Amino acid sequence: MKLTWMMIVAVLFLTAWTFVTADDTRYKLENPFLKARNELQKLEASQLNERGCLDPGYFCGTPFLGAYCCGGICLIVCIET
């Protein structure tokens, strides 16, 4: 009997916890790990945009170690692809 009540209380607690921690319980329950991953990807993309890039014809340094070329590759100078 005690085990039954303990199981009922545990299920009610976990259900309440799920609804309290969900962002929007009316439509769907979101996976917090996927949400965190998407936010991290957005952060990385915004940091790449802030870094800036070089136009074709500008010196970029050694390939793969130099500066980032806009819409091209780096072979000592930025080359359009």
Curated annotation (Swiss-Prot):
SUPFAM superfamilies (UniProt xref): omega toxin-like
Signal peptide: 1-22
Compartment(s) of residence: Secreted
Pfam family, one: Conotoxin
Superkingdom field: Eukaryota
Disulfide feature: 53-70, 60-74, 69-78
Record-level Gene Ontology MF annotations: ion channel inhibitor activity; toxin activity
The name this protein goes by in its record: Conotoxin ViKr92
The organism of origin for this protein: Conus virgo (Virgin cone)
